[in-house]
Amino acid sequence: MALLGIKLMTLVFAAWLSCCHSSSALPSSGLSGPCLNHSCLLRNSLNGASQWGTILHSPAVGSNCPPCPMMSIMGCSPPKPLQSNSYGVLCSTIASKAKQDLKLCWKEVQTRSEMYSKRISAALIDSLHQAVGMLLMIIIWIWSSIFLVVYHVLAYMTTYHLSSAVCVGFLIFCTICAFRLISWICGDLLAFNVSGLTPIWVNFSESSCPAGLSLRRYKNEKTVEGYKPFIIPQKSPKKSVIELSFSNGSHLGYATCVRLWDGSICLMTAKHCLVKEALLKGRVAGHSLPVKNFDLFLTCDEIDFSLLRGPKQWEAYLGVKGADLITSNRIGRSPVTFYNLSKDGEWLANSAQITGRHGKLCSVLSNTSPGDSGTPYYSGKNVVGIHKGTSELENYNLMIPIPNIPGLTSPDFKFETTNVRGNLYNDEGFRLSVGEDDKAEHWTDRLMKSITFKTKRWADWAEEESESDDERGKVVPPAKPSNYGEGCPPEHNQYLSDVGDLLTKVIGPEQNEKCVDILMGIMGVDKNEVAPHKEEKAEKGNEAVVSATVKTVKEPTTQCDEDIISEIVKRVVDKMNLKAIEKSVVEILAEKAMTKAPRGKRKNSKDTSRPSTPGSYIIPAKRTPDSGPVEKSLNSTGRAKEESPSGARTLPGNIPAWVR
């Protein structure tokens, strides 16, 4: 019930508002006083609802409805028909209704367009996802197909043509290694002297295509993309760069004053810069000279090179000097410099870089502008080439190298020497008489006796030093030769020497005495009959044989052949104890490694400094020329003490009063 009451009150309030709105819209003469008719309220409320944007179609409610009975009761006058309203009221009503209808249509269009745009965007997103997925699948399929093809090709080659494939791979590897070896050996000369490495298609295009249709086309100038040079204001070496201009004074190009190896001074430039009535401007002297006064004596149309001879003293007239040349056979990859004029008429040095070979020209990284043709490229103070232009197909400029002409652009040295026509002395005529005192052995002995070594000779050093400093200066006399074998037959001495060498090589010098005892027992030599000399030593290499004098020795049999030697070696080896030898060697080495070699007594060296003198005065003879008297050091590293404290007034000194 409460909700129904609220709804009824809302309907009555809306009807009252509609009535008030309609009464204000109608003329005041026809609608005087409030109207409480139910049908009028309903009609007005419907009209008001249509004005607020709600279209209601009710056939029961019309403009010609009879007057409500409530109006007579409430004192309301019946509403007037629509025909009685003015055109303004009707037009405003129609305009308001059209406005509301347009708003409704616009809202409907917005709703529909938003719905359709959402559908279209969703469809586009779905199609994009599908396209990306298909693209990825295509890439995967192509990639996997390439791997499968490579796998099948390799499987086929290894199955049916393994040897041929290995040979081809080995040849490719050898070719790459040979090319790298040639590049490493030749270096930069490979780009100019190895003509066989020039691409074949370039030569074919030059020979088969006409001049206008050639694949190698050139322009005059172009900047290189990506190359950043540095530019500084600087004049050319020897002021050798000359400006070329037209007859009206406008800029044409550049030329170079060069000095040839025959001593002449010539003008060098690009051939396309030689224009009729061209002038040479001398920036130093301010003079001009026409190019027609020069004679063209060397030209090359293939590389656009020209060399001209001028009148006498033309370089002095223009104020230039000749620069030296570097020909094409000595050019390599290196930084170079070229010179041009700025807008203010000042010379500028521009950096460039020679990168390689372009046919018979050189490729250069440089930034040039129209009018830079003919300017020279310098390596230090020498000219290496002339600026030509650029290629339409490549991203670099071109430089004209200087042709190698011996005697003109390069030196032609001829080494001349006199021929030898005979000897002044021969061996017989120049041979001098040499006495006994003049032999080489005599002078060698005298020289060795006169030399006193402060240290030992290399052959006199032992493994351990046990000598004092006084003994080091002495010369060790050579060992006396042993007198072993004086009473033995020569066959026996040779036999013992051979056996000693063999035993020394097999068992080493550690078991020398035992081996000698065994050998004497085998040969039947009595040990008591041998008188060894302890002060004498055997020669180096025969340490297994003891130096001794044999008194009585049985003569050996003449059947000393290889069987006896092999039997001796076999018996000696059987009696050897290798483990004991190895153990003793290890012990000796360990003992030597842990012991320190003794040293001689140390002595103080003599004083090398000059004696100090007491007092502050030192005589000039004892003064050191590179140092002065030592000043007193400060107490700390802080600020030095001032003569007067800060802020104190200084004494006037000898300043006159009139100055103060």
Swiss-Prot record:
GO molecular function, one term: serine-type exopeptidase activity
Signal peptide annotation: 1-25
Active site per the UniProt annotation: H272, D304, S373
GO CC terms: host cell membrane; membrane
Bilayer topology term: Multi-pass membrane protein
Region (Disordered): 463-490, 595-660
Top-rank lineage group of the source organism: Viruses
Start and end residues of each Peptidase S39 domain: 224-416
Keyword hit for ATP-binding: no
The keyword Hydrolase is assigned to this record: yes
Residue numbers marked as site, Cleavage: E221, K222, E416, T417
Role summary: Precursor from which the VPg molecule is probably released at the onset of the RNA synthesis. Essential for virus replication.
The family this protein is said to belong to: Belongs to the peptidase S39B family.
Name assigned to this protein: Genome-linked protein precursor
Organism: Poinsettia latent virus (isolate Euphorbia pulcherrima/Germany/Siepen/2005)
